[in-house]
Regions:
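Structured-RNA-binding interfaces characteristic of tRNA pseudouridine synthases
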Residues: 1-206
């Protein structure tokens, strides 16, 4: 059977989602849990490859496995073998040819800014602090310039394989800025991203 799972994870202690030769990845830790529950270590296909330190609220992945465990029981079974910073939220069976990466037509990133001189002691790991006052109205107007299909080479960090191969055209379908008190959220939806693209985009708007 082909299982589709939804995960949430705190990426602080990981080198990213994808398995890396030198580093602790979300995928490797998740596969350890799969092996503990299923007695096998199936290949997993993630919807994206988040970078080091990036968190996920609704990350989709799929894998094929022969098991009698019903999908509704998988979240509890896997969560018992996962660290507290990775959680399976839901699981279901999908068609055999389903592939999480190819089925993900858009991906949404949320970049949070704490617009205050002093950090919050409770969630400082989940935002970037900018002490100077930011004008969210002007930021929202500027954000609209990114919407559409463009060559985003200028928003790509050095060392990107996509940039090396000239594959830097992406389509942003939505980019908006909202403020709630001292918190500013920059939310971007696109068909794909370059290395550190959202971080650089957020820095440009600020």
């Amino acid at each position: 059977m082909n299982f589709l799972l939804t995960l949430a994870y705190d990426g602080t202690n990981y080198c990213g989602f994808q398995v890396q030769p030198n580093g602790r990845s979300v995928a490797a830790v998740f596969q350890d849990a799969l092996e503990a529950v299923l007695g096998a270590r199936p290949d997993i296909k993630g919807c994206s490859r988040t970078d080091a330190g990036v968190h996920a609220l609704g990350f989709r992945l799929n894998f094929h496995a022969d098991t009698r465990i019903p999908p509704e029981k998988l979240p509890l079974a896997l969560n018992q073998h996962l660290p507290p910073d990775i959680r399976v939220l839901a699981a279901r069976v999908v068609p055999e040819d389903f592939h999480a990466r190819y089925a993900a037509h858009t991906k949404t990133y949320l970049y949070r800014i704490h617009n205050h001189p002093i950090d919050s002691p409770f969630d400082a790991a989940y935002y970037t602090r900018i002490p100077k006052h930011l004008d969210e109205v002007r930021m929202q107007a500027a954000a609209q310039q990114f919407v559409g299909t463009h060559d985003f080479l200028a928003l790509c960090a050095a060392g990107s394989s996509a940039a090396a191969h000239g594959d830097t055209v992406r389509t942003i379908t939505d980019c908006h800025v909202t403020r709630r008190g001292d918190e500013i959220d920059i939310e971007v939806t696109a068909d794909g991203y370059l290395y550190n693209m959202v971080r650089i985009l957020a820095g440009t708007l600020c």
